[in-house]
Structure formats: structure tokens, C-alpha cells
Amino acid sequence: VLILSLGCENNQPDQFEKLLGDYDKSRIKFLVVQKVQGDEVEEGMKILHSLYDIASKDVRTECPLSKLRIGLKCGGSDGLSGITANPLVGEFSDFIVAQGGTSILTEVPEMFGAETILMNRCQNEDLFNQTVKLVNDFKEYFLSHGEPVGENPSPGNKAGGISTLEDKALGCTQKCGRAPVSGVLGYGDRLKTTGLNPVSYTHLTLPTNRE
């Protein structure tokens, strides 16, 4: 991994590095652009080539599906994705969870209108309350910035046949299949349990789809 920094951000590389703990310095490199004396791109390419040389010596090893963690994100919703591609992704998610693996559902704003489907699948009352808070906190975030909650569908979504946020939400929740909710992740949380885990963010680390 090559971690790029301009050099003047609030999140400084030396502080960020402390959060990584004990890590393999041969596989994780930092490049601070403002400290490069010559060509930044050339310097970056040198580092990437060194990382490639290390990675090229790696050998694949078998591991059980219980070690697999998958992330479910936006796929560009249209009028058919909720009955075609998304249910197929859901079947795959269910298969991974059934083998002891982990599935992480993102896109909280795209769940608005179908969130009760997830709430009804929570394994216990505590998870139910966490899921309710997950959704309501995002709604409050929208409202606190003067943004309407129901205008998530983009022009591209509408051109493809999506008419309301509820249409999109029913498709979004298909991506996680029928597995019970076994954990709820807040922003920045680490996984604590296998199974299906909705996460309090979108696109795995990016703003929700407005394109």
C-alpha cells in the first residue's frame, strides 16, 4: 500500500502511522508530496515498483470461506436491479455468511423506506436498537444540513426506471440476502462478529451516490 499525503492536511502521516500499530514497513509505504525534491510522480512510481517486487513473491494459500469478508455497495440502481443483480448478490452474501464468513452492508441513505426489513432480521433487541439508531442518525444528519431525506435517487437512477427512494431502498436491501443481522458497525468501528453487519457509512468510505 502506498499512502499519499500532500503534507499540509490535518491528518498528518506521522499521526496516522501511529494508528497502524506494528505493521510491515516493507509493504506499507508513505509519500509526502511536499517533501519530494524532484518529480513526485517518478518518486511514487519507484515506491510502487518496490511494492510490486515484494508482492510478486507472494504465494497463494488456501483458506476457508469463514475467513472471507465482503463489502456490499452501490451498483448503479435502475428499475430492474432490485429483481435481478441485487438478489443475486444477496444469494452470494447468504452463501458466504452460511459458511461462517462476513458480509458488510453499506449505503445507509439508500435503505430509507425499507429499513424495517433489516430491523426485523436483527438477532436480538440490542441489535434492533442499534440498527434503528444507525438509520435515524443518518436521517438526522440529512435534516440538520437542510437536505431532504427522500431525494437520494440520482438522475441516472430515474432514467433507469427508479421512481422513489423506496424503490431504490427495496433494491438496496436485496444485496444482503436473508441472513440475520449479527452486528452493527459505527463509523470507524472494526468488525467484532462474523455474519451480516450493516455499517454506518456509505460506499465503504465515500459519500452516497448523487451521480
Q: What are the language-model segments listed below?
A:
Residues G188, T193-Y201:
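Non-transmembrane, aqueous-exposed alpha-helical and coiled segments at domain scale
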Residues T202-T208:
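Conserved small/polar residues in nucleotide/adenosyl-binding loops
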Residues E211:
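Acidic, glycine-enriched catalytic cores built around paired aspartates
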